[in-house]
Amino acid sequence: MGSVRASSLTLANRSGDVKCSVAYLLYFSFAMTPKSKPGKRAPRKGPRVKLVAQAALPTRHGRFTIYGFKGSGPEEEAIALVRGKLDGKTAPLVRVHSQCLTGDVLGSLRCDCRAQLELSLKKIGQAGSGLLLYLPQEGRGIGLMNKLRAYQLQDGGMDTVEANETLGFAADARDYDFSAQILKKLGATKIRLLSNNPEKVRQLEESGIRVVRRVACQPRVSKTSRAYLQTKKSKMGHLLDGL
């Protein structure tokens, strides 16, 4: 894969460095990009995946390289955090993570998104190599405002699946073909996938990625997120233990 030259970036104020979480930086890298309506895709023209930039990203889980990718459609953009070298021979540990402003950045306990993000980075850091894809798929692909509307319905007694469907969306509107193209560009065509979602495994394999092993990504369950996770297990087939 080709490389893009990038200068180092320091965030600082008068009193010293500003400390931002990885989740905060990842989420707001997408914040200023115009989004089309959920489920609407522009016609694809030209190459599916374009490397836009790369830079060093030291984190508390180790040193990563951060890559920015864009595709042909307005919603096709993603960030990859790569640790170590991807030699194409071994199967790296991979997390394909959908952004969640309320969880990843604001610390919401309605879901386990932030806990999964942190657990994934920790595992990849400890392994010494691997990668995390961070995708703008807020609310399982329905967008931030619609996710908040779904929250409002859940406050009225619906579960996460019923709320999405009441709003006219699928329970899970995400597509992982773009993710697969990025993995191929990075040379990760066979992987160990950090996921509890068999649908994610299926879609990646259909797009040409060999998932040699699914690695459970199940942080400790909180009282607040238990019902949400039970719904994902019973209605969406997620592989979750102890629920």
Predicted regions and their residues:
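A general marker of short, structured functional hotspots
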Residues: 20-23, 172
